[in-house]
């Protein structure tokens, strides 16, 4: 995007844990809890999964006795990204000391192969490990929504402010416990008590209807509509002169330099090597 003309309107969008740089874009859509006039809208990645959101929003209206009877497994996890936060590995190992955690992805697969339908796989389990790639305020992804839609109790680690949107009575927050041992003891308690388990399913997932998918998609449409119906000269928001122009010119030079391109390729190479080594290691251990 650095090569785009200076008078172009730039809209930053991310599905990753990245904050927008308003020196480089006019508008942004992301995960951050922030307001910036008409330049920013919070629209987490999980809203791009409307069917799953609908299941999640209505899960407390189901026949909960039937849901309880459908649970034949203890806990599920479906992960194929081998570059995980260390907390995820620790949590998996600690829960596995209590009961087998069924891993249906490439990572530590222990069920004989990758699952084809994650939602159906999760539906047969009482709990599901849900760990974000990193812990950052506002960074809640589809992982939590998918587990809730599958009528699991998510064992969640990630966004420290997840309870601004999601009802804390519908999931177990790892961050609420001083140690993983303490957490596992509570999971054991819920696992052994059917009434306590069902109490998590009885609660509405969202704390406020403003966070339901239909409302948020409507707000996104208004946000985009405002940008494209505003005359070009008035829609421009970022500084394009003096220090603003110098900032962009510097970034263009950096991203176009040989050292930048070499460094980028080097980091990708290292990332790929680490990923493949981890895949080989866990593939060998799983034999």
State each model region's role.
Residues 105:
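Short loop/edge segments at beta-strand edges and connector loops
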Residues 1-6, 11, 19-102, 112-130, ...:
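Pol beta-like nucleotidyltransferase catalytic core
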Residues 15:
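Nucleotide-sugar donor phosphate/pyrophosphate-binding loop at the beta->alpha transition
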């Amino acid at each position: 995007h650095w090569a785009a003309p200076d008078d172009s309107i730039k809209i930053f969008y991310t599905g990753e844990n990245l904050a927008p740089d308003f020196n480089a874009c006019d508008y942004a859509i992301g995960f951050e809890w922030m307001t910036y006039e008409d330049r920013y809208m919070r629209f987490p990645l999980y809203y791009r999964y409307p069917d799953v959101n609908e299941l999640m929003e209505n899960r407390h209206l189901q026949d909960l006795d039937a849901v309880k009877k459908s649970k034949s497994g203890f806990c599920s996890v479906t992960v194929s990204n081998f570059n995980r936060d260390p907390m995820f590995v620790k949590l998996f190992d600690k829960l596995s000391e209590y009961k087998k955690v069924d891993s249906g992805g490439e990572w530590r697969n222990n069920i004989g192969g990758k699952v084809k339908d994650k939602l159906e796989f999760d539906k047969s389990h009482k709990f599901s490990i849900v760990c974000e790639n990193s812990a950052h305020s506002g960074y809640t992804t589809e992982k939590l929504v998918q587990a809730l839609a599958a009528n699991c109790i998510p064992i969640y680690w990630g966004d420290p402010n997840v309870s601004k949107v999601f009802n804390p009575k519908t999931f177990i927050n790892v961050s609420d416990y001083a140690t993983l041992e303490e957490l596992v003891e509570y999971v054991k308690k819920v696992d052994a008590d059917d009434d306590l388990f069902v109490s998590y399913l009885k609660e509405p997932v969202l704390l406020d209807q403003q966070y339901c998918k239909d409302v948020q998609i409507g707000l996104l449409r208004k946000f985009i509509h405002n940008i494209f119906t505003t005359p070009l000269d008035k829609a421009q928001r970022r500084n394009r002169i003096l220090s603003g122009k110098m900032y962009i010119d510097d970034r263009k030079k950096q991203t176009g330099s040989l050292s930048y391109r070499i460094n980028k390729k080097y980091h990708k190479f290292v990332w790929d090597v680490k990923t493949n080594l981890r895949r080989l290691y866990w593939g060998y251990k799983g034999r």
